[in-house]
Amino acid sequence: MKRSLAFFFAVAALAQAPNPDAFYKLGPDSLPQDGVPKGEIRGPFKIDSKAYPGTFHTYWIYVPAQYDASIPASLMIFNDGQAFMNPNGDARAQNVMDNLIYRREIPVMIGVFINPGHTPEQPEPTPAEWGDRTTNRPTEYNSLDDRYPRVIVDELMPVIYKDYSISKDPERHGIGGASSGAIAAFTVAWERPDDFRKVLSIVGSFVNLRGGHAYADIVRKSDKKPIRVYLQDGRNDNRGVRGDGNYDETRDWFFQNVRLMKALTEKGYDVNYAWGMNKHGQKMGGAILPDMMRWLWRDQPVSTDPKDAAERSFREPVKKN
């Protein structure tokens, strides 16, 4: 009887515990605003992959209203593109770019939303199914090798350069993602810093799915690279408790994100981080996506005219060391 009562109260306590994700809500910079020009999302488009023979990648292009082909734009790529561009999702990156570009808090940029690769027989990832069990996502995103960087730099970028006026300056190229898409973004910049130097990571899977927990040690042992990183994670992310109840720190998302942050800090990287109470997903990362973008793209000069009604951040451009 005592055991039954204890079990009942434990279940009742869990049922009444607040959902930590419920604290995170999208703010005005993540929602359409009156008077803010809307960019256009074009696509879907497809490219065959040589890095992963037999697969192809689907992607969409965000073109801001302020885009001028005579002026090279910056570039921001989002892995798991379908999730980041979902108009009812937790990130709504196209709205964020609309608002921040209009406010001149980030530069005019082309956005690319790219999905994991898959074979013709496999389904396209969706907001409900990101493709972990149905596409090439685990191999592409979680592997610490140069194949996915080749997809982005050698397969996707030439097509984007052909169709749009984009700066060749790697300081003006960013890439981001969530979960496995976040570690994939880090891998692209780590392997190809001459092409990408800004990384946005939401609940990054820097864990032992395919050796990702090694990144903290790799960072410490490697020469410093010219990349800027913003990490976000939460204390209620997957915490490394195996099915048998044993704890495995190499599978603890929050622990490994903190380890990576410390390693980057010790090496003198331009790194920022935000730790919250969120579970695994985009809830907190989506809510703070505007701030993450502002910080990553804080290099450009902005207006200091007090009569400028659009500009709202009176900062000077970041000085290069």
Give the predicted meaning of each segment.
Residues 7-16:
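Hydrophobic h-region of N-terminal signal peptides that target proteins for export
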Residues 1-4:
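Positively charged n-region of N-terminal signal peptides that target proteins for export
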Residues 16-321:
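Non-catalytic cap/lid and distal C-terminal segments of serine-dependent acyl enzymes
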